[in-house]
A protein has these predicted regions:
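N-terminal subdomain of nucleotide-sugar transferases
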Residues: 1-59
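Acceptor-binding helix/loop patch of EC 2.4 sugar-transfer enzymes
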Residues: 8, 68-75, 98, 125-150
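Short, glycine/serine-rich, charged loops/turns that create anion-binding
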Residues: 10-11, 43, 67, 110, ...
Length: 150
């Protein structure tokens, strides 16, 4: 099975916990015989619209996009709004019906919705959203679990 992992920042440029967790998940899938391609924006101003690199055994497709981390709100909003457009423009020539068997994408970036939809339609596959920041406090506040369950 070939999975596309989509996240708004990734190793080695990111030290954020989300990128580390997704990398560990990718390595686990690879250890179980699957193939993983991470699709992520470049944090550096790259000259190519798409750079393909390997990190450990994970294929990483970095597309050119403006910064979305550690920048002002207006700049971040513009760059996040353009993420799906920039990603699809960069990867569309590499994505065929048989490229991916599934998509795993990491919240909270709602701006990947159009990209996920395009890949799902092209590859006729399912997508799975990894929700974060809902446990434990959100679940307690919503009354789903009690503070004693932690």
């Amino acid at each position: 099975m070939h999975l596309a992992f989509i996240i708004d920042d990734y190793l080695p440029d990111s030290t954020r916990v989300g990128s580390k967790m997704l990398h560990e998940l990718a390595l686990n899938f690879i250890a179980n015989g699957h193939q993983v391609t991470v699709i992520t924006p470049s944090v550096n101003h790259q000259s190519n619209s798409l750079d393909v690199i390997q990190i450990d055994e994970v294929s990483v497709w970095r597309f050119a996009n403006g910064p979305v981390k550690d920048v002002g709100k207006v700049k971040r909003a513009i760059n996040e709004t353009l993420m799906s457009f920039n990603a699809w423009r960069s990867i569309s020539s590499k994505v065929t019906k048989d490229t991916f068997d599934g998509i795993v994408y990491y919240s909270p970036s709602v701006f990947f919705g159009p990209l996920v939809k395009k890949i799902k339609n092209k590859c006729e596959c399912n997508a799975y959203l990894i929700l974060r920041d809902i446990f434990p406090q959100w679940a307690i506040d919503a009354g789903i679990i009690s503070t004693k369950s932690l």
